[in-house]
Amino acid sequence: MDEHSIMQAVAVARGARNIEVFTGAGMSADSGLETYRDPETGVWSKVDPQAMASIDAWARDPEPMWAWYRWRAGQAMKARPNAGHETIAYWEGSHLVDAVHVTTQNIDNLHERAGSTEVTHLHGSLFEFRCSICSKPWRDDGDYPREPVERLAPPTCSLCGNPVRPGVVWFGEALPQEEWAVAERRMREADLVVIVGTSGIVYPAASLPVLAHQRGVPILEITPKETDLSRIATYSWRATAAEGLPALVRRLGV
């Protein structure tokens, strides 16, 4: 984006009071966590999503999936929030805005660890667990494998004895109703939407920014490459989260 367009985008952002930040896997890429759909390095280039992210696979044999998600949780805990995460949290705490809300498709906890307090997880979390049958929550013991392992037996529910599952949304499952309702409301109330690090191809999550677009709300996209959401963006910056977000907020004088 040329300098004139950058200054226009900054002027629009400077007048906003209620910010909605919509993030995807690219948000955490600068923290060393893999994205999902990169053909060479993405998560789904290395494992079959139907084997590691479906309720049918869990019902057949939960041990490989439990091992994989426990290892991923450990990797996420080793990662550190990057400058993009930290900038969002800093923006939230500034006196120039009324609110900075985050709606994320990510299942890590880097937004929270950076200091953001208003975070909605559309696809669940690596750090939340529940019984696969009765849904009773299970408290994470923080015991993560240091290296990938092929199988781990999941713990059993203290109430009904069935396996405890990761609190993430698998393919074919509905998004959590409460989180979806919050995300919809925030998109309808925002006066600026900032899209960061998402390909915009995973639905229904990708439909959320359209709600703001239909109201004429300015949308700023920060992502290294053009995406399916670029068409509705008022301004698109070709930058990573760790580059683009600090540059934006620095220009705002926050």
UniProtKB/Swiss-Prot annotation:
Residue numbers binding substrate: Y69, R72
Principal localisation: cytoplasm
Cofactor: Zn(2+)
Localization in the cell: Cytoplasm
Enzyme Commission no: 2.3.1.286
Binding positions for NAD(+) per the UniProt entry: 24-44, 105-108, 197-199, 241
Any one GO molecular-function label of the UniProt entry: protein-succinyllysine desuccinylase activity
Top-rank taxon: Bacteria
Domain Deacetylase sirtuin-type: 1-254
Family annotation (Gene3D superfamilies): SIR2/SIRT2 'Small Domain, TPP-binding domain
Active site: H123
Record's keyword annotation contains Lipid metabolism: no
GO cellular component, one term: cytoplasm
Annotated Zn(2+) binding sites: C131, C134, C157, C160
Binding note for cofactor: Binds 1 zinc ion per subunit.
Catalytic activity entry: N(6)-acetyl-L-lysyl-[protein] + NAD(+) + H2O = 2''-O-acetyl-ADP-D-ribose + nicotinamide + L-lysyl-[protein]; N(6)-succinyl-L-lysyl-[protein] + NAD(+) + H2O = 2''-O-succinyl-ADP-D-ribose + nicotinamide + L-lysyl-[protein]
Keywords linked to the UniProt accession: Cytoplasm, Metal-binding, NAD, Transferase, Zinc
Role summary: NAD-dependent lysine deacetylase and desuccinylase that specifically removes acetyl and succinyl groups on target proteins. Modulates the activities of several proteins which are inactive in their acylated form.
Family: Belongs to the sirtuin family. Class III subfamily.
Comment on protein domains: 2 residues (Tyr-69 and Arg-72) present in a large hydrophobic pocket are probably involved in substrate specificity. They are important for desuccinylation activity, but dispensable for deacetylation activity.
Protein name according to UniProt: NAD-dependent protein deacylase 2
Organism, scientific name: Corynebacterium efficiens (strain DSM 44549 / YS-314 / AJ 12310 / JCM 11189 / NBRC 100395)
